[in-house]
Every structure is written in structure tokens, then in C-alpha cells.
Amino acid sequence: MYTPANNHNRSLAMSTQPTPAAARHCKVAIIGTGFSGLGMAIRLRQEGEDDFLIFEKDAGVGGTWRVNNYPGCACDVQSHVYSFSFEANPEWTRMFARQPEIRAYLEKCWEKYRLQEKTLLNTEIGKLAWDERQSLWHLHDAQGNHYTANAVVSGMGGLSTPAYPRLDGLENFQGKVFHSQQWDHDYDLKGKRVAVIGTGASAIQFVPEIQPLVAALDLYQRTPPWILPKPDRAISETERRRFRRFPLVQKLWRGGLYSLLEGRVLGFTFAPQVMKLVQRLAIRHIHKQIKDPELRRKVTPDYTIGCKRILMSHNYYPALAAANSTVITEGIRAVTANGIVDGNGREREVDAIIFGTGFTANDPIPRGVVFGRDGRDLLDSWSKGPEAYKGTTTAGFPNLFFLMGPNTGLGHNSMVYMIESQIAYVLDALKLMKRRELLSLEVKAPVQERYNEYLQRKLDRSVWSVGGCKSWYLHPVSGRNCTLWPGFTWRFRALTRQFDASAYHLTTTPLAALSNEARQQAEGVPA
């Protein structure tokens, strides 16, 4: 795999550059231990590269499937496609795996490939800065430790930082407050009056779990989601035995599920009229599970299905229809010491407030964390929303790769497929760096710009843009869709199958050591 240039005839080769004595060096630094980070580490090891470190801010691995452990937490993509292609699991017990089983799967992968020795737990990278003189990334953790790396792979994704709405008076509330991603399992909800704020993917899973326990459940809904029945079921021991004995059967099953899911993209991007048929199914689901006309009205969206993420549940609507549940659509005026005042001025007393308000997906990395060439903050480059070339690299940030980066999200299939596509692209880039003794590679700004213009043209015609809703897919400042891939996943895989060196500035000498004219040429700026 990737080895820094070490030719004795070239005094500027990276391996001859001194690094601070306190810094621990690796060729590849991987941030995060979800599907992205672990997948990258496993593939590096399979390719024979062992000089890498994995940084994980939490006390264990699993990423979002470790920290999101609220009641009812589960995947909304079938288990056999929501897993690594190179690490099939014949032991899935349900069609849609629940959080403990997915976390256990990732932990098993971590252990099988002996990644414990490469993982630094409880190590949050607080600053990441590019050093032009040495062509290295400097990483600093919260404890003050210093690391350097030739390349950095970010596997943090966009679902790592909880989003909280701004509510007047929240600081005065005397009861319990927490976000679904930071569930307080020590707090007993039994017999409590609970307010749930938000109706996203997390809320529709935990609301049915807590509704039978609480004395009263007030659900504050700004925009209702479209919800389809969830075709979940247990996978029998007979089926699991068949998958164990005949791996090809499981492979064919996985392929069939993938193809079935892949076809759904037609309604999102190519033929939005198809969504009318899906919308009828969703309306039928509402009428089947809710008898009260007023509640039906409250939970029926006024936008085209697919504009916001389509959710799946078989027990959310019955939970809302229960006698102890109230759906409040008037908004929130303020939070008081003992409750919440709605938009009509009515105060409802509660013992606890639970946020089901999602994540900061459009600004996944805060300001002051990542600094590229010339000390540029990543958020300055992303002022109109996250932007990358093939969702993986960003101009001005050499040797930095994003997995689950901008415009790689899906509304129809498994993200693991996209992650594996990106991993293959990054591996090919690292191989090129070794083969050609490169110190750095950086996507050309015009190439990145043209690629994203192409994406936005496709997205402008999609249901996500014309469906009549305001969703977290769209950046709050620019209105651009910085989240989703507007097409078939196999098309993205074709684009990332091979690293396209012509789209990049490739350097064998640190830019800081070049003459001004040579530096401008390397950066693609006319002299």
C-alpha cells in the first residue's frame, strides 16, 4: 500500500522530514469506527497495509450504532444489504436488524480483523491541520496528544452531532431533558408526563416503545412524515442454517434485495409521478391504523412523498392514537419551569422533554476543526454547504478523504454500498501515491465545481427539490441539496471504480519548497 517517497536522491522526500518528537506518526489516520471507519481499516489490512491508526471519540466501536441506543432503535434497510459485502452475516435474526445486533456485528468485524491494536478509544480529534512544508496532516486530540499522518480518512458521516432547536426558556425547565442520541437509560419514564419534540426517523421508533409506559405523551410535530408499513419479520433458524451452509444462497438473496431497493430511485429522480402510487399506499396506511378524522388530518403530510425521508413503521400510528397521546401541531412558544407553552398559548406540564430532532447533517464538522492549505477552515470552503468531488475529496485539502461525504446519501438503498464504493476509490488513490511516490494529491477546483454543477442540475429535477417540503436534505443557507446522490448506486460505483488522477494536482515536492512560479503551476493558477 501507500509508502511515503524515500528516494535518497530527493532530499525533499516526505520520509526525510523531521516531525515533532512528541508526535506519533502513521501513514493513514482513520477517524471513526462505524461502517466507514472500520470498512476502511479492514480493506487496508486486506491490501497488506498495516501502518494506520483509528481514532474513536467514544469508549467503544460502532459509531452511530453505538451511540444511538434509544428504545426501538433499528435499521430501515434490510439486514442482508446493510452489511459489508466482504463480511456476510448469515446470523441476522430479523429482516431489519435492531441496534444491538448491528453494533454486535461491527464489534465482531473489529475483533476478527484484529483492529483493537490499531484503535485509540476515547480519543476525539479536536483539530486537524495540513502542513504544507512537510506534506503531513497534524492531528490533535482533546487530551493534547499530537499525531501526524500522510493521509486522513474521515469516517464520521453526517449523523454524529445531535441537532437541537432553539427554544425560549429551555434553560429554566426543572425536569429531565435529553436527545434521542444521548438517551438517559437511568431515567425511569414509567408514569411520567413526557413531551417529545420532533417526528423524524428516531422519534417514530422510540415513541411506540415509551407510549405504553408514560402517563401522558405530548408529541410536538412541525411537519408530519410520510410513513409506509415496515415489512419486518424474524428470520427463522431454518433460513439462517441455509445461509450458513450455502453462502451462495445468501449472496443471491442479498443481490435480489439490492435490485429491489435500487428500483425505487426511479420515483425519486427520473419519474416523480411514480411517487403518486407510493403516496396512495401511505394514505391507506394512515386510514387503516387511525380512525379519528382529526388525528388523520394532523399526521397527513401536504407535500409529495419522498420529498423528506420516507419512514417505515407498523406501530407509530397506533401509539399516536392511544388514549394517553396528544399530537400538538401549533408549534412551541416557550418552555417554562414545569412545561411547554404551545403556539396558542396553552401550557402543558411535563416531567421530561425528549428531542427527536435529528442531526446537523448539513454542517457535520464544526468551525475551527479542519484546516487545509494556507490555514483555510473547511467551513469557509463549505459556506454554501458541504461540497466534494465524488463525495470524497475537497479542493484545498490535500490527502483528506471523506467517506459518507457530501451528496453520497441515499433515500432508496443501503449506505454500505456507497461506503464500499468510496473505500475502493480511496484505496486506489493511496496505491497511486505509493506507485508514483507522491507526497500529495488534491482535486482541482474547476473539476470539483463542474462535478457539483452536474449534481445540482440532476437534483433540481428530483422530488427532493420539487416535492414542496423543507427538509434536512437542503442546506439552510444556500438551499442546495448537499446530502443525496441523485441516481442509481451502481452509477456511483462506476464513477469511483478507478481513481482518476487527471482530476487532481499531484505533487512530489512540498509546495512550500517550490518557487512561486512552480507553486502556482502546481496549484493550477496561471503564472
Curated annotation (Swiss-Prot):
Residues that bind FAD: S36, E56, T64, W65, R66, V67, D76, Y82, I125, M415
This protein's UniProt keywords: FAD, Flavoprotein, Monooxygenase, NADP, Oxidoreductase
Keyword Transmembrane helix: no
Molecular function per GO: flavin adenine dinucleotide binding; N,N-dimethylaniline monooxygenase activity; NADP binding; oxidoreductase activity, acting on paired donors, with incorporation or reduction of molecular oxygen, NAD(P)H as one donor, and incorporation of one atom of oxygen
EC number: 1.14.13.-
Cofactor(s) listed in the protein's UniProt record: FAD
Residue numbers marked as site, Transition state stabilizer: R309
Matches recorded under SUPFAM superfamilies: FAD/NAD(P)-binding domain (SSF51905)
Record: residues binding NADP(+): A74, C75, D76, T199, G200, A201, S202, A203, I204, Q205, R222, T223, K308, R309
Pfam families: FMO-like
Protein family: Belongs to the FAD-binding monooxygenase family.
Known function: Catalyzes a Baeyer-Villiger oxidation reaction, i.e. the insertion of an oxygen atom into a carbon-carbon bond adjacent to a carbonyl, which converts ketones to esters or lactones using NADPH and/or NADH as an electron donor. Thus, can convert bicyclo[3.2.0]hept-2-en-6-one into the oxidative lactone products 2-oxabicyclo[3.3.0]oct-6-en-3-one and 3-oxabicyclo[3.3.0]oct-6-en-2-one. Is also able to catalyze the sulfoxidation of methyl phenyl sulfide (thioanisole).
UniProt name for this protein: Baeyer-Villiger monooxygenase
Organism of provenance: Pseudomonas aeruginosa (strain ATCC 15692 / DSM 22644 / CIP 104116 / JCM 14847 / LMG 12228 / 1C / PRS 101 / PAO1)
Lineage of origin: Bacteria, Pseudomonadati, Pseudomonadota, Gammaproteobacteria, Pseudomonadales
